[in-house]
Design a protein with these regions (language model features):
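Periplasmic polypeptide-binding modules associated with outer-membrane biogenesis and secretion
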Residues: 1-186
Length: 186
């Protein structure tokens, strides 16, 4: 996390509140790339000490004090690493239409679950190949960002939504909703 090459705050640099906020975002993102699904930049704050000398401020990043007053359950949730249990693909999702059970099809393999109505939007292997979120892997915010990018690059897909559901103490199910664009008539 304290990657000296990437950190935004260095000794001798100008005191800038925007840069301090960007550093909080960078650290929180680094935590989420390492499996800490619930870690948020709002958990971090700074102490700034200007008594050191003329035009000098010592800045220290720390965790917010309100964390001390939170339940142990909350603290464990925030500082626990999460793994992906299953990746669910919901294909051709249409919020305006709830299909009957007879219309829905489901298949699964190796921790991936596919649910669709009618003709399948894409083959399972195409979906899996383009999905950097993998069952058994640690949660990684960067994998989620790459998944959005990859799915938006596939021709038939116009809508992508990725969400997570906590299913046990340290496991998340990933839900990926993919929809094709509406056909336009002329």
């Amino acid at each position: 996390i304290a990657n000296n090459q990437r950190r935004l705050i260095t000794g001798g640099s100008q005191f800038d509140a925007e840069v301090l906020n960007q550093e909080r975002q960078r650290v929180a993102s680094a935590m989420r790339r390492r499996g800490y699904f619930y870690f948020d930049q709002e958990l971090l704050c700074y102490d700034a000490d200007s008594t050191r000398g003329r035009k000098q401020i010592d800045v220290t990043m720390r965790l917010q004090e309100y964390l001390q007053h939170q339940s142990e359950e909350y603290k464990e949730k925030v500082f626990r690493k999460y793994h992906i249990a299953h990746v669910h693909f919901h294909l051709d999702y249409d919020p305006a239409r709830v299909p009957d059970d007879e219309e829905m099809f489901t298949s699964s393999a190796d921790g991936y679950v596919f649910t669709w109505v009618g003709k399948k939007l894409l083959r399972d292997k195409v979906l899996v190949r383009n999905c950097p979120i993998e069952p058994g892997a640690m949660y990684n915010e960067r994998a989620v960002e790459r998944a959005y990018t990859r799915f938006h690059q596939l021709a038939p897909i116009k809508y992508v939504d990725i969400s997570f559901e906590q299913i046990s103490a340290n496991e998340l199910d990933c839900h990926i909703v993919l929809s094709r664009g509406k056909l336009k008539s002329v």
